[in-house]
């Protein structure tokens, strides 16, 4: 019988934070990272000084450098890696899964290069039998790891699996977990909000005020909802944690890499230098192209996403992009 409640793949900031939160709940957790030297350092220091300095690991948080050992240690495998490596990680873990394995991901985004939902990628690689779930919501890794009050949502392909995960992560003192059956809506909210957050950051970097920021957030939510409706998501999902909640958090708090990236662009710093200053993956930059392409393919109007795409991938002047949005044909709000 497997004694590890969950194996977490990805020893970055969010994977580490989830491991700490789950271990704090009294569960045995195994954390795997691709760099053996990094894992060795985590084991020696019993904290992740690179991403979450001075937050100590609970004793029941274990470290592992062998992928095979990590995957075979638990039935529950949670993936917390950037979206552009999600496909490769699934491909790498697939040989070690068995008939009891269940896969969850906290990755936010669409597949790099194809624009596919991560659920589609998982089904293609893992087959139809393995239960799947996505874990998302308005959460910064540091606050979760510290133990400050946080809420997230789990959407699962199987209702009983979703309920088990909800109970596994939920903590009355600090971590409230909601359950959903809308995997499409939960995935979409987590992907598109990062793109809108870049726009909110650009607006603030240009010196526009709170009025402009909230207009971007509100109209950004409308764009997410339109795309979600066209993809078969439940509109109510976008008024919850993984829609409105995650969008507002990412657009307004400077812990957000996507927002900070946008601020730098708004101040006139070029893309490569902005990425360098952020120092970690900016998911919104990678996903802007995928979201824009998806919207065009299915005929959904997303003017904010389109202008951010024009800035990031076509070299459009930021002031010109802002003017394009402001000068659009007048219309009813809803």
Swiss-Prot record:
Protein family (similarity comment): Belongs to the NAD-dependent glycerol-3-phosphate dehydrogenase family.
EC number assigned by the record: 1.1.1.94
GO cellular component, one term: cytosol
The protein, known as: Glycerol-3-phosphate dehydrogenase [NAD(P)+]
Reaction(s) catalysed by this chain's protein: sn-glycerol 3-phosphate + NAD(+) = dihydroxyacetone phosphate + NADH + H(+); sn-glycerol 3-phosphate + NADP(+) = dihydroxyacetone phosphate + NADPH + H(+)
GO molecular function: glycerol-3-phosphate dehydrogenase [NAD(P)+] activity; NAD binding
Organism: Bartonella tribocorum (strain CIP 105476 / IBS 506)
Binding locations of NADPH: 13-14, 108, 141, 257, 281, 283
Family matches, as PROSITE patterns: NAD_G3PDH (PS00957)
Enzyme class: oxidoreductase
Role played: Catalyzes the reduction of the glycolytic intermediate dihydroxyacetone phosphate (DHAP) to sn-glycerol 3-phosphate (G3P), the key precursor for phospholipid synthesis.
BP GO terms, sorted: carbohydrate metabolic process; glycerol-3-phosphate biosynthetic process; glycerol-3-phosphate catabolic process; glycerophospholipid biosynthetic process
Catalytic-site annotation from UniProt: 193 (proton acceptor)
Keyword annotations from UniProtKB, A to Z: Cytoplasm, Lipid biosynthesis, Lipid metabolism, NAD, NADP, Nucleotide-binding, Oxidoreductase, Phospholipid biosynthesis, Phospholipid metabolism
Binding sites annotated in the UniProt record for sn-glycerol 3-phosphate: 108, 137, 139, 193, 246, 256-258
Subcellular location: Cytoplasm
Gene (name only): gpsA
One Pfam match: NAD_Gly3P_dh_C
Protein's pathway: Membrane lipid metabolism; glycerophospholipid metabolism
């Amino acid at each position: 019988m497997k004694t590890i409640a969950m194996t977490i793949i990805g020893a970055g900031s969010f994977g580490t934070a989830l491991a700490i939160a789950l271990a704090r709940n009294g569960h045995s957790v195994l954390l795997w990272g691709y760099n053996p030297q990094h894992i060795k350092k985590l084991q020696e220091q019993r904290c992740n000084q690179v991403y979450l300095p001075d937050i100590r690991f609970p004793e029941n948080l274990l470290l592992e450098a062998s992928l095979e050992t990590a995957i075979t240690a638990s039935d529950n495998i949670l993936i917390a890696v950037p979206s552009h490596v999600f496909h490769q990680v699934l491909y790498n873990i697939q040989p070690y899964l068995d008939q009891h394995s269940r896969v969850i991901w906290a990755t936010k985004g669409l597949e790099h290069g194809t624009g596919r939902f991560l659920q589609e990628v998982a089904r293609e690689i893992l087959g139809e039998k393995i239960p799947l779930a996505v874990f998302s919501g308005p959460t910064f890794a540091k606050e979760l790891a510290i133990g400050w009050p946080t809420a997230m949502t789990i959407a699962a392909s199987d209702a009983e699996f979703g309920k088990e995960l909800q109970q596994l992560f939920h903590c009355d003192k600090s971590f409230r977990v909601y359950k959903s059956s809308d995997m499409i809506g939960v995935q979409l909210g987590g992907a598109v909000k990062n793109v809108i957050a870049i726009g909110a950051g650009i607006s603030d970097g240009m010196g526009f005020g709170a009025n402009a920021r909230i207009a971007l957030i509100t109209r950004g939510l409308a764009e997410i909802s339109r795309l979600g409706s066209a993809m078969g998501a439940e509109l109510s999902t976008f008024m919850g944690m993984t829609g409105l909640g995650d969008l507002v958090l990412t657009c307004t708090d400077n812990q957000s890499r996507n927002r900070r990236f946008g601020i730098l662009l708004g101040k006139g710093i070029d893309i490569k230098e902005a990425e360098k200053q952020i120092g970690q993956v900016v998911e919104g930059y990678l996903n802007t192209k995928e979201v824009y392409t998806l919207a065009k393919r299915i005929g959904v109007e997303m003017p904010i996403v389109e202008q951010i795409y024009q800035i990031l991938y076509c070299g459009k002047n930021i002031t010109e992009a802002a003017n394009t949005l402001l000068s659009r044909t007048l219309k009813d709000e809803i």
